[in-house]
């Protein structure tokens, strides 16, 4: 066993500087794990100087040879003609000092590991030093053969190898003076020539795909991780990927006390940054003999879905009644808020979507779903542990039930952004104050569309799954129009894109302000705690109504509105779509270079997307809605003349139309094996015919043949016509309203029988439609059309 000389970095500073003047070079390498052992390269004439509180120990040169070849192949160390080694990027922490007098120059393509100069402590005999040099030379020859082999190699990260070395040393499983690789092999650890660390290959051209599964994302990573507690093997692509090993889109699911979740993301590793690489790089894996624990998990690979499949039953009326009585307790809601238009980025610029798309997870059903996933995972883990004992790992179980989400443009996976729904993230205090039913929230702040993308319209695609690999599915936004810049000319009402470019009464808008046009100073109008304020993180969707001046001259809670597009000079009412809180009546004015335009000619110009506007108080024409820091105040403008007012930056608001896509579901009969998506969305309901011959036609999207329509707690025969149309019969009132449901479906005011319409999948997943069917309306009006409020 070798013992390397240790020293204090501060005390060695002057010595190192003098050595450098003699032709030696210093290379710094980061260390994260606070091990009590020296775990780093000591070959090719390098000496380690690292402060440590415990006695240092040495390791076989076999393993260290791999470390050096790995650094060299990752282009962090290069050779010059004189045989010196240089680091391209100076790092920090541990210091390695090279002794060129003991080095043997070699070609740049071949790792050099001869002429090693080990500084040993006085406790080590000189004869052992000779044996160590021989062992190092043999190890160097083995490591040098790395470039001569073209067979697949395993990927190993720095944390794994450090733990492997620690286990080997503590167990005394090898002799440091041995020149063979059998010591490591006998310990069931991969030998150095089984590893290969390479630069990521160029990504293939993007391919459109319908779905985004967590398994596909893992297989597309350019560096496949090797798991410590699960053995040293990554399964081959011919066999299914163990979904229980997935965590955070493909990161190792084991618990590492020296690594945090935030240090590893789907496109970065804890050692080599590949943030500039695409997910589409092909992966290289090899199948080595598995450990008992891995074999046990491999045998149980399909057990998670089989456990779910055996327990799934068709939905019962009693369970449906329970769900309809306690929707807040059971239902999971995904709401995607976004702007209706997005500015295109040109060249190297990145115009991030403003306001940023926001995803809200609403309902206590999310906690119930997480608990179910955790229980299934524990059941599977207990099954796999029967043949392979392993200590319980609470951090591992927590990661297995963490919700992982990505969002991107369309089906393209190359520019996806991860959404932070982790348990340990810092929560905004306003989340619960605004709505106690909000489970989680996240904004996608770095999405943009480049000029190379020729699409005129696109949608956002959000993918959800759990760390154990249990997939929830993909959920899309409403359609978004791409624009080059805000329109400066008068919009024509004949324009086919008028509904996107102009703002109509009754639609939702967002308002934001930028001081001195700086992106970092963006503030959004938002409602929190029953009060308006300016937020840098959240934005509100406000319904803008055209106020009918002739019918309502006083400020009241109930006011008359009219349809049509919003023009400058119109009186509008802004109502928060979540809380219902409204601003007083305001007159919308056009803004040009911090001046409000009051010309009568502006009344003929409609308000367009991303226009700058001001909101003038009705009672005092010199007062405007304004923000000051995080507060909303009234700003006193300066009159330049009868046609213009001077305002400050805080009173100039940018207006943009917004939209929302909402999905509601509940796994009524327990966790299901298949993804929740595609989630059907019902847009409207039409009633055809009279009396007993009446039938209902549902219009929407993503309908499937395995869906059945339910009137309250009563299923009815359903005919699938297309993905946009379902037909069904109307059940008799006596069948819908019975002793159990009389109180639930009877309107106490009118006495009418009103039942909610739901779609139910054959495995018990309930999708709420947001529609209610009234039997009295059917008797009075016959055929009719009902539009969903979702």
From Swiss-Prot:
One of its GO terms (biological process) is regulation of cell fate specification. Its main location: nucleus. Residues 680-776 form the IPT/TIG domain. Residues 343-353, 484-489, 514-519 are annotated as: DNA-binding. In young adults, expressed in germ cells in the distal most ~10 cell diameters of the progenitor zone (PZ), and also in late pachytene, diplotene and diakinesis of oogenesis. The keyword Glycosyltransferase does not apply. Residues 1-27, 92-125 are annotated as: Disordered. It holds the Pfam family BTD. InterPro entries: Beta-trefoil_DNA-bd_dom, BTD_sf, CLS_fam, Ig-like_fold, Ig_E-set, p53-like_TF_DNA-bd_sf, RBP-J/Cbf11/Cbf12_DNA-bd, RBP-J/Cbf11_DNA-bd_sf. SMART domains: BTD, LAG1_DNAbind. Belongs to the Su(H) family. Transcriptional regulator that plays a central role in lin-12/Notch and glp-1/Notch signaling pathways, involved in cell-cell communication that regulate a broad spectrum of cell-fate determinations. Binds directly to the 5'-[A/G]TGGGAA-3' DNA consensus sequence, which is present in the regulatory region of several genes. Acts as a transcriptional repressor when it is not associated with Notch proteins. PANTHER family: RECOMBINING BINDING PROTEIN SUPPRESSOR OF HAIRLESS. This is Suppressor of hairless protein homolog.
